[in-house]
A protein has these predicted regions:
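Short, charged/polar connector segments at secondary-structure boundaries
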Residues: 1-129
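Amphipathic, charge-rich alpha-helical segments that serve as recognition/docking helices
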Residues: 72-78, 123-181
Length: 181
């Protein structure tokens, strides 16, 4: 609802993406970080969550969203700390340059790492930097077709750009299992 309200305002610009079988120029907006959450369906994050559940014996989905965000943030930071430190300094200096993608309920489709870094910047400096992103008109939970199309978009974004981090063998395996489900 707050995200949908943002879409009634003038966008900051448009970004081309390939979505639902077409190239589309979709508007993007600055979104308050409090309206967003990490995507536990993201293949890399999902792998870490499964490991967390195995280690702690806890069902991750039963945790409050703020606790989920904190745990996922720590997972992302510690996985590639030196790379994250470099990108953190870059975002501090230049702001967020790459536009992310979120669902209409605030789940991040593309940009989990940038979201984590912006949370860290805001926490350390008491700034209120927003997350710049396209807001999709659907969620993973709307229907199976929506979930399928959003996963295809996520895969296209992750695999379609040279600058994205490579997936490990386990992440690729989990991706295939999750895609088939």
């Amino acid at each position: 609802q707050k995200l949908q309200h943002l879409k009634t305002k003038d966008p900051l610009g448009k970004k081309p993406i390939y979505y639902r079988g077409n190239r589309q120029d979709l508007p993007f907006y600055d979104i308050d970080l409090n309206l967003l959450r990490f995507n536990p369906l993201n293949d890399r994050i999902h792998t870490d969550i499964k490991e967390y559940e195995q280690t702690t014996g806890m069902d991750f989905n039963l945790l409050p969203i703020t606790k989920m965000n904190t745990i996922i943030s720590e997972m992302i930071w510690s996985k590639h700390e030196s790379k994250n430190k470099k990108t953190l300094e870059d975002i501090k200096r230049k702001n967020q340059l790459e536009v992310g993608v979120v669902t209409k309920d605030g789940l991040i489709v593309d940009g989990n790492r940038r979201f984590m870094l912006l949370l860290k910047i805001n926490e350390e400096s008491s700034e209120n930097r927003p997350f710049r992103a396209i807001i999709l008109d659907e969620t993973y939970d709307d229907d199976p077709t929506s979930k399928f199309n959003i996963k295809l978009l996520e895969m296209d974004i992750q695999d379609g750009e040279d600058t994205k981090e490579d997936y490990s063998a386990i992440d690729k395996y989990i991706r295939v299992i999750n895609f088939v489900d």
